[in-house]
């Protein structure tokens, strides 16, 4: 199995075998302290559960990953294809310090000990690791970001900033809404076809007047188009909307919910 489920002190999370050499994880809703409707491991700032519970949830999740939550760098997602190059000065932004950036759906860095953190409650998340140049990326890739090519653009940004070669990169695509549940109107397939071309049709099923879209499959196609090798890409295959016991799903729950995170960090002291 390319993805592993872990449980410790009530926390449940997933990791990808392809990223075993770096601290990383995909959270679930299990193991935190937030009350309903954010029960219980909500990691979304600014919700009704309050900052104290949010910080405790981060402390718990980052502890099982061996990471320091006080150095986490959080995205500021608005379904864009914008990428931020993270430096040591960004440590703690979004959690302990205000973010001085907006409209950022992907983060990259080569600084050890800076956990890059992106959010999801159905959207795709992609974690990237360059073992040659010791660089990482974290991407929020919902359908708008997917259609805008954020995954391919993040790979290119890592190349420009750190010399990362696509063939060296390792990638893990976390739990997201699956084609079983991601039912859309025609605008989503049209946007995907405009971006990716005919290959899109393999990831879209027509059901009457509606379309079912394989978001993870399309994000994987962007990775392949960017030059990643198929054997260096792992996909969770887990649908967030099918598992309300484990995940929050915007499609199933609306706005009154928490969010999961995908986080990756470079080891310190190497």
Residue ranges and their predicted role:
Residues 1-270:
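Active-site microenvironment for binding and transforming phosphate-containing groups
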């Amino acid at each position: 199995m390319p993805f592993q489920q872990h449980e410790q002190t009530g926390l449940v999370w997933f990791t990808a075998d392809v990223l075993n050499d770096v601290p990383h994880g995909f959270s679930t809703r299990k193991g935190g302290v937030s009350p309903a409707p954010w029960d219980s491991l909500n990691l979304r700032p600014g919700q009704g559960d309050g900052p104290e519970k949010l910080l405790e949830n981060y402390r718990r999740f980052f502890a099982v990953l061996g990471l320091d939550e006080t150095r986490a760098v959080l995205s500021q997602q608005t379904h864009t294809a914008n990428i931020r190059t993270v430096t040591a000065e960004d440590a703690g932004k979004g959690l302990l310090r205000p973010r001085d950036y907006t409209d950022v759906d992907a983060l990259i860095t080569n600084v050890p000990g800076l956990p890059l953190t992106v959010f999801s409650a159905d959207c795709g998340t992609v974690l990237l690791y360059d073992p040659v140049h010791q660089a990482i990326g974290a991407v929020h890739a919902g359908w708008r970001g997917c259609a805008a090519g954020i995954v391919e653009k993040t790979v290119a940004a890592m190349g420009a900033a750190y010399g990362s070669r696509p063939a060296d990169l390792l990638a893990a695509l976390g739990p997201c809404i699956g084609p079983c549940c991601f039912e859309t109107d025609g605008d989503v397939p049209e946007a995907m076809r405009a971006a990716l071309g005919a290959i899109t049709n393999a990831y879209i099923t027509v059901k009457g007047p509606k379309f079912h879209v394989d978001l993870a499959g399309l994000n994987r196609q962007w990775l392949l188009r960017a030059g990643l090798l198929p054997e260096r890409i792992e996909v969770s295959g887990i649908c967030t909307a099918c598992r309300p016991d484990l995940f929050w799903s915007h499609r199933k729950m609306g706005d009154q919910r928490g969010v999961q995170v995908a986080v990756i960090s470079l080891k310190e002291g190497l």
